[in-house]
From Swiss-Prot:
This is Translation initiation factor 2 subunit gamma. The keyword Protein biosynthesis applies. GTP binds at residues 16-21, 144-147, 179-181. The gene is eif2g. GO terms for cellular component: cytosol. GO terms for molecular function: GTP binding; GTPase activity; metal ion binding; translation elongation factor activity; translation initiation factor activity; tRNA binding. It comes from Methanothermobacter thermautotrophicus (strain ATCC 29096 / DSM 1053 / JCM 10044 / NBRC 100330 / Delta H) (Methanobacterium thermoautotrophicum). The keyword Magnesium applies. Zn(2+) binds at residues 56, 59, 71, 74. Residues 13-20 are annotated as: G1.
């Protein structure tokens, strides 16, 4: 389990405010690795980077904080603090569903706000509310691009941020001025992450449970059938541990026809390989993002077709729900729209976008009451009682976050 990241930290904020550049400044790794993204320059699927935080035993704080093995200031070998997985969530408004499913994997978050634009931008607002709704408590604000604004604008931007975070989970968050492009104040940011975003206590003795955020076929077109690798799923363990050779179950699984009806069947397979932080492992635990090789037909896992599933020890996973009753907690205002619109009560018959763990599905409200509602899902979700879910409603051409529900 050594070499594995201990914690997932989300990078959230408006498009082009520098989330991916910040990852690069911290790690030397671009998270925009999917070809379609690099073309559009936007992180579409959740981008991941594992970063090792280290500390020089000789230098004073904050200069002692680094990601380099040899201190650039004094040449001393640095000491390992911990390995962290950064989840780079897309800042484009049409990709809010991906941001919400990523928030399910976050133990803490860094909200990136560019100093050269007025704060808040629409997605800055939407992402902060999403963190609030999903219940991510430990937040740090990075005021980025300070190298391209005047001192006056930097201070004005700081005041705008302070005003904007009032009454949210980031009200007391430290605000760190940074230039991701120049690498300025990255040491202070690492120090702040170490102080503010602690590794949560995890239960490794419970049955393994993993939220699946990606799934793919790693075979090249035209590969020899004898050498084909099985399908791969990627995501984060929230409890327990997985070992090579373990049997796993994946729910809700795949859609099959049974007696002329469409139904869902969970998948069972054996773990053939585990990868975390770019290294092969025999065993993985919670924290960080892991790739799990299986014996599944790669056609079942290609192009993220299993993302949103829950995987783990067979027979221990939450039930697959096609409908549920939820307690509803609505925000006062719709987030992300230009005009401030009041959130109307949920109505019978309306469709809602529902994020359950890493699943995004649409639920139609069968019956709505003052503080709870019954919904029927278009795509089933593997979810337990008491789980928090994000609720969005169609406003104009977009889904907008309106609050959260708790499954009853």
């Amino acid at each position: 389990m050594k070499n594995q990241s201990e914690i997932n930290i989300g990078l959230v904020g408006h498009v082009d405010h520098g989330k991916t550049t910040l990852t690069k400044a911290l790690s030397g790794v671009w998270t925009d690795t999917h070809s379609e993204e690099t073309k559009r320059g936007i992180s579409i699927r959740l981008g991941y980077a594992d970063i090792t935080f280290r500390k020089c035993p000789q230098c004073e704080a904050p200069m002692c904080y680094t990601t380099a093995e040899i201190c650039e200031r004094c040449g001393t070998e640095t000491e390992l603090l911990r390995k962290v997985s950064f989840v780079d969530a897309p800042g484009h408004e049409t990709l809010m569903a991906t941001m919400l499913s990523g928030a399910a994997l976050m133990d803490g978050a860094i909200l990136v706000i560019a100093a050269n634009e007025p704060c808040p931008q629409p997605q800055t607002k939407e992402h902060l509310m999403a963190l609030d709704v999903i219940g991510v408590k430990d937040v740090i604000v990075v005021q980025n691009k300070i190298d391209i604004v005047s001192k006056e604008r930097a201070l004005e931007s700081y005041r705008e941020i302070k005003e904007f975070v009032k009454g949210t989970c980031a009200e007391d968050a430290p605000i760190i001025p940074v230039s991701a492009q120049q690498g300025a104040n990255i040491d202070i940011l690492i120090e702040t992450i170490e102080e503010r975003i602690k590794t949560p206590k995890r239960d490794v003795d419970k049955p393994a449970r993993m939220y699946v955020a990606r799934s793919f076929d790693i075979n090249k077109p035209g590969a020899d059938p004898e050498h084909l690798a099985g399908g791969v799923i990627g995501g984060s363990l929230v409890q327990g541990r997985l070992r090579v050779g373990d049997e796993i179950e994946i729910r809700p699984g795949i859609q099959v026809k049974k007696d002329g009806k469409q139904t869902w069947m969970s998948l069972h397979s054996t773990i053939t390989g585990l990868v975390a932080g770019g290294e092969e492992m025999e065993e993985v635990g919670p924290g960080g993002l892991v790739g799990v090789g299986t014996l599944l037909d790669p056609a079942l896992t290609k192009a993220d077709s299993l993302s949103g599933s829950v995987a783990g020890e067979p027979g221990t996973l939450p039930p697959v729900r096609h409908s549920f009753t939820m307690e509803t907690h609505l925000l006062e205002r719709v987030v992300g729209t230009k005009e401030e619109t009041k959130v109307e009560p949920i109505k019978t018959g309306e469709p809602l976008m529902i994020n359950v763990g890493t699943t995004t599905t649409v639920g139609v409200v069968k019956s709505a009451r003052a503080d709870d509602a019954d919904v029927v899902l278009k795509l089933p979700a593997c979810a337990e009682e008491g789980q928090r879910i994000a609720l969005s409603r169609r406003v104009g051409a977009r889904w907008r976050l309106i609050g959260y529900g708790i499954i009853k």
